[in-house]
Amino acid sequence: MNGCEKVFHTMKEKGMDLAVLLDPADIKYVSGFEVPFWPAWMGDVSNGLPMVTAIVDAKREQIQLVASDMYRNKIIRTGITNASYFRSFTHVESNDVDDNYKRNLECALGEAADGRKSLVVGIEENYIPECTMSVIRKVIPQCTFENATQVLKSARYIKTIEDIRGLAEAARVADAAQEKLYEISQNEGNYTELDIWFEVQKAASHAAGCLTPFVGELVTGPNTGLSDYPLGPTSRKVERGDISIMDISPRVNGYWADCSNSVVFWSNPNEEQLR
């Protein structure tokens, strides 16, 4: 079974009729759409509302997305046709983002409920805002809420072929970044930590073929012995003989990689560094 089929199967086993998902990882798993990883910016343009909501209908085995119109073309390019869009960011006309979101979600939920007023609805308790809950209660007044997070965890526990390929690709991108760090450590130059970080980010994005969301830490010299994460990168100039630790996590098509390595710049490691 693919990921979506596993979710439908698990929902039916648990007696869950619908699920309303907001976790970007879960949306990617059931729909194939990778929600762009810009959480702070997304909150600004959508008034803090979810930029993408996935409605999972176990009985019909259907997925419907309710998304900001900023993602319309990206979703269409993904090949998804079952989606509706609400107007979010605009600076040229009067616009009520809250009302737009609620009306679109209400319409999509109404289609999924198909007149049924008493359904078991799965929600992600740590993600769902009250505005989304209020729409569910309005459309399905006699609904019972269950924890969809556990359903998704159960479905995702055993990886599919698509998962394995996605994780392998994310690991390849992380490797490209670490290889760039090693390459710099073998060829002396005039670098700050920030200079190296930008080169590493560029290597990761080049390997992925697109701008790659990237978090982590790069520290050099005396800061490598501290544990107050994150301590870098900073504008500190890298010196010959400096040890460095780089811990990075790129996100590629909805999958995270995590990799940490250490190098010594333009010199062999001393006894303390080896220890």
Regions found by a protein language model. Name each.
Residues 1-176:
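A composition/biophysics-driven feature that prefers long, compositionally simple stretches
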Residues 30-42, 129, 147-158, 190-271:
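Short catalytic-site patches enriched in acidic/histidine residues
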Residues 120-125, 182-193:
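Conserved short loop/turn motifs at secondary-structure junctions
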Residues 135-140, 184, 199, 203, ...:
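Alpha-helical structural signal in soluble globular domains
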Residues 10, 177, 203-207:
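Short alpha-helical functional segments enriched in proximate histidine and acidic residues
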Residues 171-182, 193-201:
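Active-site pocket-lining segments that scaffold enzyme catalytic pockets across diverse folds
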